[in-house]
Amino acid sequence: MNSLEKAVWRSRYLSRKTKVRIFGSLVMPVLLYSCEAWTLTGGLKRRLSTFVCNSLRKIFRIRWQDHVSNQRVLEMAGMSCVTCQIRLRQLRTYGHVLRCPSTDPARRILRAGEPRGWRRPAGRPRKRWLEQLEENLVNVRVTGLAAARTYAERSAEVWKAKVDAAKRLPGACPHT
């Protein structure tokens, strides 16, 4: 990341638009690699958001004294927040997995519960991927996994339209 900062972000020869496009095409795919399988915790959300906003602040040469909000920085870059991008990717992946045959390993993992004889550790249970997915479905205006299953199994186009509509809903992303 330091080499990008020295060679690209500080460059006076590249426009800010070009720098944002480089950020979106080189940094974001690496940052979000396999994010479809993550369970987002509060700490992970904060660290991802901090990294993205700090990088964009370097691109736009915004100092901390300028008092520019993270929302404004994302608007300047024409990006949505990282957690919302991850949520949409997870929803797309869920629809894809539901359309797989029932013998597919990914589909079987979704149906599998806890192994027999296994006990959960003491303390507050960690959030599971399916529990997080149920929360994400609220943003798509789908109530419950059963309703999501019917939409996703109908066709890829129906599910894609439902997920894409979630991007445009007001309040779909509470962070922006």
Where are the regions a protein language model picked out?
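Short linear motifs embedded in intrinsically disordered, charge-biased segments
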Residues: M1-T176
